[in-house]
Amino acid sequence: MKRVLTALAAALPFAAHAADAISGAVEHQPTNWQAIIMFLIFVVFTLGITYWASKRVRSRSDYYTAGGNITGFQNGLAIAGDYMSAASFLGISALVFTSGYDGLIYSLGFLVGWPIILFLIAERLRNLGRYTFADVASYRLKQGPIRILSACGSLVVVALYLIAQMVGAGKLIELLFGLNYHIAVVLVGVLMMMYVLFGGMLATTWVQIIKAVLLLFGASFMAFMVMKHVGFSFNNLFTEAMAVHPKGTAIMSPGGLVQDPISALSLGLGLMFGTAGLPHILMRFFTVSDAREARKSVFYATGFMGYFYILTFIIGFGAIMLVGANPAYKDAAGALIGGNNMAAVHLANAVGGNLFLGFISAVAFATILAVVAGLTLAGASAVSHDLYANVFRKGATEREELKVSKITVLVLGVIAIILGVLFENQNIAFMVGLAFAIAASCNFPIILLSMYWSKLTTRGAMLGGWLGLLTAVVLMILGPTIWVQILGHEKAIFPYEYPALFSISVAFLGIWFFSATDNSAEGNREREQFRAQFIRSQTGFGVQQGRAH
């Protein structure tokens, strides 16, 4: 059955990743009952898991980190589920559909950050921290200021990510399911709160695992059917795609996506270092028992995500052949029905019929829930653990801390729903770019230098971290996306779309300069404590494991 999907503006490249940020107006669609039934099955099953998890959440450790008893394989699958989004699936395949080989290059940008996490961060992070990355950043530095900075960096990233997720969720669900936008946003918000409020990290982990399995299965089936169509020959795949694509052989050439070298470098640095500074990703490394399992988590996650991005490349070229060359998927003007971001959805219909289209639509919805649940838990832990229990109310009991965390979940959920409704017709794609830039410019430098640079002091971390955060925000506002496209000015003050190259440089230089010039007695004590921190980060001596974690 042909589904009529209305025109949808293509999201900015950053939105192709984890924001599910589908921008532009959409109209109410016919109800997709197959998708709704499949999604209801997923919801009932995951709510059952949440009920099961709620019976096992008895302590702060259980709530924040699932007691540290998630295996490396399970955590790797959950990390992949947390990182691979609906728009990663739709957006990257759409990028391949329109730009060919450049889409593969762009997708690699989201993978290059993982070797950094594997070799530089995962092991030491697990050995030094308990619940949040602020535990690591403040290990030998002054607790109050560093936790405030880390929590602010986390909350800004979470807020920007969450708004983009909620708006994108409403648009995507309205498009795929035929549900009203406001109903879709409220539904996502309520389910998100239920998962995190009652099941904590254990429920969130299993929602992410199930979503990852479903997404990998769906993408694998689509790629298999595409390869079957071309006799399992990549040569045939590329030859047929070039024959029908308007750009012809140019789709096999790189360099057309970001032609300015500074923008390309800035985009790459933002993707690479931003990944290593995302709070909801870093939090996952505390769910395993030790550093060895943390390393295994990254290994498995990288494997799953690498496989997924290879699948999106095949799906994108399959869409060129089976969707782009099929008039049934074009509107009267010759454009793809629903916009280029719907290329993978149309391909699902082409290779598996309406039933498989319903399955892919349900998986897209499940994907959104998995991502927002992880974001909400990261935001709640930043407020309850970093700010409440370690800054404003030192010595608070576990019960008090958990109460604050659950109140924060409710507040974040309500705010996310309200902002999701208010931003319905706004261009929110820039929020994902800003979230990555802040994660790369504030969170990542502090985490990295706190673990590796013996001369880091509280003064340097504070001033450099705030400089990086503010630089990223200011340059993003003055850049082409916000200053010209949103605010309507004729010319951008800052000429580049991605600020990461400059804001990361400012952060590292600021941290180095203000630490190097810090001759205070407190700064000298912090330098002396690095050796003890280094030994623990390398050996894990003193780290609590398992349920005692």
UniProtKB/Swiss-Prot annotation:
It is a multi-pass membrane protein. The chain crosses the membrane at residues 33-53, 77-97, 103-123, 148-168, 183-203, 206-226, 262-282, 303-323, 355-375, 404-424, 428-448, 464-484, 493-513. GO terms for molecular function: acetate transmembrane transporter activity; glycolate transmembrane transporter activity; symporter activity. One of its GO terms (biological process) is sodium ion transport. PROSITE patterns: NA_SOLUT_SYMP_1, NA_SOLUT_SYMP_2, NA_SOLUT_SYMP_3. One of its GO terms (cellular component) is plasma membrane. It is found in: Cell inner membrane. Keywords: Cell inner membrane, Cell membrane, Ion transport, Membrane, Sodium, Sodium transport, Symport, Transmembrane, Transmembrane helix, Transport. It comes from the Bacteria. Pfam families: SSF. Signal peptide: none annotated. Its main location: membrane. Belongs to the sodium:solute symporter (SSF) (TC 2.A.21) family. Transports acetate. This is Cation/acetate symporter ActP. The gene is actP.
